[in-house]
Amino acid sequence: VVHELRARIRELGVRLGKYAPGAKNAITDVSGVRVGQCTVRRGASGPRGSGVARTGVTAILPRGPQTFHERVYAGCFVLSGAGEVTGLTQVAEWGLVETPILLTSTLAVGRVVDATVKYMLRHFPTIGGEHEVIIPVVGECDDSWLNDVASHPIEDAHVFEALESAGDGPVAEGCVGAGTGMMSFDFAGGVGTSSRMLPGGYAVGVLVVSNFGRLADLRVDGVPVGQLLAPRFEGTERRAHVHGSIVAAVATDAP
């Protein structure tokens, strides 16, 4: 597979916001945060039931491998949400997160939760004994327009790969990891990340999985790009339901 390197939006001269990005312009500019991904691609485009896989897993480790022993303060916010994030009730109640945060396909949530528990027990065998049980934080978006979700392509090994490959370097974006089969504004969507450096030397980083919107609604820095491009894509097949969703993780080292 040949991956074409594409410019990020700031490299094209578009400047969003008043603060400068960090060195990587990624959530990993926040000290301690690591990100790992596993992309699952199988088969050519085909009808439901053909076993085509366009999916994956994205893992965010707030404090790297020590997230369980070094819990971080956390909160949550839901706007018109109809999706699922496991463990969110505990986060809201305790104000803490003690597991990696994983993102994946809607019908893979159960598998990813189970695999994450296996991973955590392997690394922290005192869970359920000396220490309390855990509820992994796993969020989802629906990639069923490009991915044959009924074939259950996500396996434990994919979750382990995402977790074990997590690093603090640049983060791959676009159709990778959990974003592999996502659509945004009728184009390929996927994973996106950015960061901003604040006065005092603090960093704020964001990672999203984007899976929503119609072409006509696409704007870039206020410019109605979608409306300008629409004539080029007349007659192009599009998914019927575009309400979709977006999942975002925000990290900061500010006090």
Show which residues each predicted segment covers.
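A structural signal for small-residue-enriched, beta-sheet-centric alpha/beta enzyme cores
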Residues: 2-255
